[in-house]
Every structure is written in structure tokens, then in C-alpha cells.
């Protein structure tokens, strides 16, 4: 729905008068990502999957060129186990190429890590009755209501350091504050921030120096006999990603019939309530 300048300011009186010329209102979903991930895992376990946390792949076993086993390290206890399978799916996000190295192969695509940072501030920092979205020179900035807080972000920058610890920098925080403060009536300061968090997007690599315009689409490939890799994608397409990756793996299973995918008709646990 198109909104006039006055209509936009009624919805978000915390915006500066002189930056608003109008607005567009639309409705979207709000997802608790941690709960969603746990629910997907619980659903998989209900269907027969074995789910392990604190587990790292530290080696792959090959017979000839075919991957036939994986060495798994329990990072809590230090114990190792070996898993055998007809086919392995490498769905490790920004660690995709680390698995390729363990297999001694080079995949048809590479994955670049793009760091995204968000800040969290109390709801009274901004007077608004809806989430807000602004266009920046590089991307977009979201101001999202979350309980008693606003989540504000994000950034989009290359990350070539420790993949397990994508730390937010003062420059990241200053970037977010500078852009949101261009729009809001009362400036938000570092002192208002109650939390900062960051993560890495696994982007299928292109030729551009910047990650901003790299494809968020996913890619699936059989990188070696017995090993299928999938990378890229996003939350909203996770079932399609899943289906494509499993379909590629099924093609590499020898001497066994595999039933068709049922993901498009299988609800997550609790969805029927």
C-alpha cells in the first residue's frame, strides 16, 4: 500500500520530517531463526535422522576417487568416530571449500564469506509501529521490532579471518548508526546498544570484488564420486535447496531405489497445531 508523507509519519513518527516523501507498506513474516533451526532438526530426527552437535569433519576416506567415509571429531570430548555412507552431502556453508580440501578436490564453484552485523537497541530509541526498511548506497538497512527491542542492520563486507568468529568491528557499528541516524529524529548512540551480533553468509562466488551483488541463489554439484556439495541460498528457499541437494546425491547411489522427495508435503513438528 502506498503511503503519503503524512501517512508514513503517522506510522513512524520517529522519522525525520525532512527525509520522508512517502512510503510503501507491505506485510512479511517474522521468524525466530534459532527456534526454526531446532524445529527442522527435531523434524529430521522424528523421521529417522541422527542429529549431533559439537561435531567437526576432520577427514574423509576414499577408495580410489570415491569418498566412502568421514572422520568426525566430538569437539566437547575430543573423541573421534568414523562414518561410512554411499554418498555424503557437504552442506557446510562458509566451510564448503574446507571439505573440498579434505577430499582433495576442487569444486565448480567457490564460496565467499560475507559478514553481516546487527545491533540491538531498546524499543524506546525509536517511535514507530512497524518495521522499517531504507535503501543505502550499498544495500538496504532494516529496523525490525523484536519484543522490547529493535534489531538494526545489516552490513555486507568480505570476511577472510577465522570463519568461526566473525567479529563485529567498531566500523561496522558506526556504519549502521550513521545510516539509521540519517533517518531518525533522535540519534541512536553506542550507549543505547544492548547487544551486537554477526554472522557469515555463504555466497556462491562471482567475479565482482564486492560481495553485495553476488547471487544469493544456491548451487549444487557432484564434486567427487560419493560427495555432493551445496552452497548459497537463504532461509526462504531452504526446502528447495534440500530437495536439489538430495536429488543430486540420489543420482550417485548405486543399486538402490530411492523414493521421491516428500518435503513439499511434510510439515515441521508442531505445524499442525
Regions found by a protein language model. Give the residues of each.
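Short beta-strand segments that buttress and anchor functional surface loops
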Residues: 26, 70-74
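Conserved SAM/SAH-binding loop
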Residues: 54-58, 74-76
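Substrate-binding strand-loop-helix patch
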Residues: 31-36, 83, 235-240
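Flavin (FAD/FMN) cofactor-binding and adjacent substrate-gating region
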Residues: 1-42, 46-47, 52, 60-66, ...
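Short, hydrophobic/aromatic-rich segments at coil-to-beta transitions
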Residues: 66-71, 127-129
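C-terminal catalytic lobe of FAD-dependent flavoproteins
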Residues: 43, 101-152, 157-273
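Core beta-strand elements of the Rossmann-like FAD/NAD(P) dinucleotide-binding domain
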Residues: 76-87, 91
Amino acid at each position: 500500500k502506498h503511503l503519503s508523507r503524512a501517512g508514513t509519519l503517522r506510522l513512524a513518527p520517529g522519522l525525520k520530517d525532512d527525509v520522508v516523501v512517502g512510503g510503501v507498506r507491505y506485510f512479511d513474516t517474522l521468524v525466530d531463526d534459532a527456534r526454526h533451526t531446532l524445529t527442522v532438526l527435531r523434524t529430521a530426527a522424528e523421521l529417522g535422522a541422527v542429529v549431533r552437535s559439537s561435531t567437526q569433519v576432520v577427514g574423509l576416506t576414499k577408495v580410489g576417487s570415491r569418498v566412502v567415509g568421514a572422520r568426525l571429531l566430538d569437539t566437547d570430548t575430543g573423541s573421534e568416530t568414523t562414518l561410512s555412507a554411499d554418498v555424503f552431502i557437504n552442506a557446510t556453508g562458509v566451510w564448503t571449500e574446507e571439505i573440498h580440501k579434505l577430499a582433495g578436490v576442487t569444486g565448480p564453484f567457490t564460496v565467499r564469506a560475507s559478514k553481516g552485523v546487527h545491533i540491538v537497541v531498546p524499543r524506546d530509541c525509536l517511535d514507530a509501529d512497524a518495521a522499517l526498511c531504507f535503501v543505502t548506497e550499498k544495500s538496504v538497512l532494516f529496523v525490525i521490532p523484536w519484543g522490547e527491542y529493535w534489531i538494526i542492520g545489516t552490513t555486507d563486507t568480505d570476511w577472510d579471518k577465522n570463519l568461526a568468529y566473525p567479529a563485529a568491528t567498531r566500523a561496522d557499528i558506526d556504519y549502521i548508526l550513521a545510516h539509521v541516524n540519517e533517518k531518525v529524529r533522535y540519534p541512536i548512540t553506542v550507549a543505547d546498544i544492548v547487544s551486537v551480533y554477526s554472522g557469515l553468509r555463504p555466497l556462491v562466488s562471482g567475479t565482482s570484488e564486492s560481495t553485495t551483488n553476488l547471487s544469493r541463489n544456491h548451487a549444487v554439484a557432484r564434486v567427487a564420486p560419493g560427495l555432493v556439495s551445496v552452497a548459497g541460498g537463504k532461509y526462504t528457499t531452504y526446502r528447495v535447496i534440500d530437495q536439489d541437494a538430495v536429488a543430486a546425491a540420489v543420482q550417485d547411489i548405486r543399486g538402490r531405489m530411492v523414493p521421491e522427495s516428500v518435503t513439499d508435503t511434510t510439515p515441521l513438528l508442531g505445524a499442525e497445531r
